[in-house]
Amino acid sequence: MTVDAYHEIRRRALERIDGSGLDPQRDTARLIELLRATVDDYQRHAHLGETRSLADPDATVRRLLQSVTYFGPLGDLLARDDVEEIFIEGDRVTFLEAGGRLRGLDVPSSESENRQVVERLIAATDRRLDASHPVSQARILDGSARLTAVIPPVSDHLSATIRRYALRKETLASLVELGSLTRGAADFLSLAMSASTSVIVSGPPGAGKTSFLSALIAAVPSDHCVRACEEIRELHVPIVHGSYYEARPPSLDGGGEISLRQLVKATLAMRPDLIVVGEVRGGEAFELTRAVNAGCGLACTIHANSAPDALDALVNAALMAGENIPERVVRKVFGSSIDLVIHLERDIEPKDGGIRRQTMEIRALVPSLHEDFSSEPLFRRDRLGGPLEWTGSMPPTSLVRRLERALPGQVNLTQVLEGAASW
């Protein structure tokens, strides 16, 4: 069946549905009869020589049924566990498999059909996608995926990405198995999370920042209170003591919005040991200055090309709050309270073409008399695919004291950094 043939049959079927007053979601039996009648009509015209006949009419009926009542050309992709991301650009659909290979969809689709699927996914949420809200993000499929969609006039055509959340439970140990961390680095980070340190995870899009943040949360002791705030819920690590909070867009009348900054501000009054922000992008960073000043631990992700860039990006985000606080003050607050920056990178695996995600360095901030941040690499990987090694450096004295308080008497921090002793 050609793409043009499918789209013509689908157009006729939709016209019949509209004219019949049929509710496709409630009367499946009548819908199937209508779709089969539409396909039979097309076949009769084909036998008269007006067009090419369908090789498998039953398959066409099933495809139409999926388009009208389910998720159309995306249905099979959304049902697969090995698909990480789906990219929709007009009538084109590509997807990223778990191994990192990008493939094209071999099922015919059109922009109108793809948009109908996207709108159907968003309709099940409290978000909107229309002329007044041409950019939308939503947690879809019972929270198992995130949809980001843009439509004209903001974009030339429908442009959407569906990101599936990893079904596996990320832990620091699993990151060791994947080659992103060494045992020494994982043990050190586990120790850091038990001591309520403030950690930033940085990297480009797709580097695995959210998965890494999940692994850090999983290492937090169960008696610590964790408050996790996100624009769109992506983290799903079980929290024994604490909760997750999700921002809310404005309603149709423009009211009811709950921003990420408001959520972070609210959690400060809830006695957190650790505040988690899924992704820092704007004014919520200013509220984090209050959090770290209050002695709370912090864990967040931020887009950046290096660990030093991540610190600058955090300051710039805090200044976006418009509180007229001098930049030097913001830098001083973050410089004296952030403990670690973990930078991740991604590239294409040379052997099989899959995506490789690895930790490039773990840096500790050190006290500085200047406005600029000062940091020291504790673990470093010179290149993607190379070994992640302890540099021999130790964290600043204040952090060492906090970490060693959490260690059993027979183990010291040097042994942990060397990977010679777990704790």
Where are these regions (language model features)?
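NTP-binding/hydrolysis catalytic cores, primarily Walker-type P-loop NTPases
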Residues: 351-423
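Helical/strand "switch-coupling" subdomains that flank nucleotide/phosphate-binding cores, especially
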Residues: 287-290, 333-361, 367
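The conserved Walker
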Residues: 204-206
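P-loop NTP-binding catalytic core
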Residues: 80, 96-195
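Switch/coupling sub-region of P-loop NTPases
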Residues: 199, 215-335, 345
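Residue-level signature of catalytic and energy-coupling elements of molecular machines
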Residues: 13, 86, 149, 275, ...
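Conserved lysine of the Walker
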Residues: 209
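N-terminal accessory targeting/assembly segments
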Residues: 1-130, 137-140
